[in-house]
């Protein structure tokens, strides 16, 4: 009896305890978590205002106005006026007046007056004045005094006293010493200067400047130094 009674209370009490524990644990979480806690209040309180405030306005404000405001007006305003305003007026304003104003007046103003004003007066003024002013007075002034000064005093100084003292011996040395260099000095530069004018019209300055001073300086200095010494010595000796 004692053994049977002790065994019976051990077996049945754990069974109802297990049933009692499982029953209250299973139904309350199903009823609390599913309809009340997780689904209804969480979705209504947290995600609804979050979806309405964060994604809805962001999605509506960013892509919708962005596509309409940025893309549409940008493509219409940027390439539209730029392509129409820049290309059309630029090609008409920049190359149009430049090509008409620069090329046309430049070719008419620059080469026109330059060709008429520069070469025209230059060719008429430079060679004309040079040939008339340089060649003519130079040949007239240089050979004139040189031919008159050299032979005139030579003939007057030397043959003057020579015929009074002795005609024959005095005339011979006078003719040899004076007349020969006189004819050489007078005739050579004159003959050389007469054809030089014709030849020196083309190289005006080159030929006129070089031979003239050389010929004028050499004969002018040489005859007065030689002739007066010989004339004075002959007059004194006689």
Curated annotation (Swiss-Prot):
What protein am I looking at?
Small proline-rich protein 3
Region called Disordered, residue ranges: 1-67, 110-238
Q: Where are the N-acetylserine modifications?
A: 2
Region named 21 X 8 AA approximate tandem repeats: 52-223
In which organism is this protein found?
A: Mus musculus (Mouse)
What is the annotated localization of this protein? Cytoplasm
> What protein family does this chain belong to?
Belongs to the cornifin (SPRR) family.
Where does the record place its sequence repeats? Answer: 52-59, 60-67, 68-75, 76-83, 84-91, 92-99, 100-107, 108-115, 116-123, 124-131, 132-139, 140-147, 148-155, 156-163, 164-175, 176-183, 184-191, 192-199, 200-207, 208-215, 216-223
Keyword list (alphabetical) reads: Acetylation, Cytoplasm, Keratinization, Repeat
Record flagged with keyword Acetylation: yes
State its role: Cross-linked envelope protein of keratinocytes.
Q: State the signal peptide span.
A: none
Q: Does the keyword Oxidoreductase apply?
A: no
The cellular component terms of Gene Ontology attached to this UniProt record, alphabetical and capped at eight, are: cytoplasm
Q: Low complexity bias: where?
A: 163-175
Q: Which GO terms describe its biological process?
A: keratinization
